[in-house]
Amino acid sequence: MEKIKIIVASDSIGETAELVARAGISQFNPKQCKNELLRYPYIESFEDVDEVIQVAKDTNAIIVYTLIKPEMKQYMSEKVAEFQLKSVDIMGPLMDLLSASVEEKPYNEPGIVHRLDDAYFKKIDAIEFAVKYDDGKDPKGLPKADIVLLGISRTSKTPLSQYLAHKSYKVMNVPIVPEVTPPDGLYDINPKKCIALKISEEKLNRIRKERLKQLGLGDTARYATEARIQEELNYFEEIVSEIGCPVIDVSQKAIEETANDIIHYIEQNKSK
């Protein structure tokens, strides 16, 4: 049997659409009905919808969506029809029926149900955010983030992002690499929400050589040479100086300790 590909799209977390999709999949023999589910949370623009449409076209996927804002729902409906894609609007028909029954218009606010347990769902939002904007994947996350972590490779950016997300902070991390120009938006946001992660040359050299060993590669690869590391550190210092953000040395710190330092700084500077 051909693998079933499902795209879950939502202007909130996407949990409702995913639960419905998985409930549907569970009604088929799992040994025969292989499936692949991709979640696209926080659909906020027509460009986000276009991305979902393109993936569905490329993979022949079914789109299962819960879009609350009328303009986003309409745009998705039009694009699905235009490209003759397979889709299910989970919320639309129910919202229309409820609206007709009570003779009132809905609030059309994505994620309103999550206010039933604001603290819990704030954490879920933050975790989803950290995944979506990990490793500088999408610069659109910069103005939305509570914290932006900057650092070269092997400075624990991703684990720190996830740890802080479990504390309900929306964190985006941006790798600083000489060959890649930092996103323009990095210079537009408040530098007080940026944290640069510094590491000593010696510690980074050891970490990278160990990483190469794990991959079955020799420790003479350019990735772990002193010249390459110094080049990256110099570039890092240059970018951090331009942004004007604080620097935390993570060379001798556990992730929890670094995270606590970050939280302390962010909370102190919230109102400034």
Curated annotation (Swiss-Prot):
Superkingdom per UniProt: Bacteria
Enzyme category, top tier: transferase
Family annotation (InterPro entries): Kinase-pyrophosphorylase, PPDK_reg
Entry GO MF terms: ADP binding; ATP binding; phosphotransferase activity, phosphate group as acceptor; protein serine/threonine kinase activity
Keywords from the UniProt entry: Kinase, Nucleotide-binding, Serine/threonine-protein kinase, Transferase
EC number of this enzyme: 2.7.11.32, 2.7.4.27
Residues reported in the UniProt entry to bind ADP: 151-158
Reaction(s) catalysed (UniProt annotation): N(tele)-phospho-L-histidyl/L-threonyl-[pyruvate, phosphate dikinase] + ADP = N(tele)-phospho-L-histidyl/O-phospho-L-threonyl-[pyruvate, phosphate dikinase] + AMP + H(+); N(tele)-phospho-L-histidyl/O-phospho-L-threonyl-[pyruvate, phosphate dikinase] + phosphate + H(+) = N(tele)-phospho-L-histidyl/L-threonyl-[pyruvate, phosphate dikinase] + diphosphate
Protein task: Bifunctional serine/threonine kinase and phosphorylase involved in the regulation of the pyruvate, phosphate dikinase (PPDK) by catalyzing its phosphorylation/dephosphorylation.
Family statement drawn from the similarity comment of this UniProt entry: Belongs to the pyruvate, phosphate/water dikinase regulatory protein family. PDRP subfamily.
PANTHER family, per database record: PYRUVATE, PHOSPHATE DIKINASE REGULATORY PROTEIN 1, CHLOROPLASTIC
HAMAP family reported in the protein's UniProt record: PDRP
Protein name per UniProt: Putative pyruvate, phosphate dikinase regulatory protein
Species this chain originates from: Staphylococcus aureus (strain NCTC 8325 / PS 47)
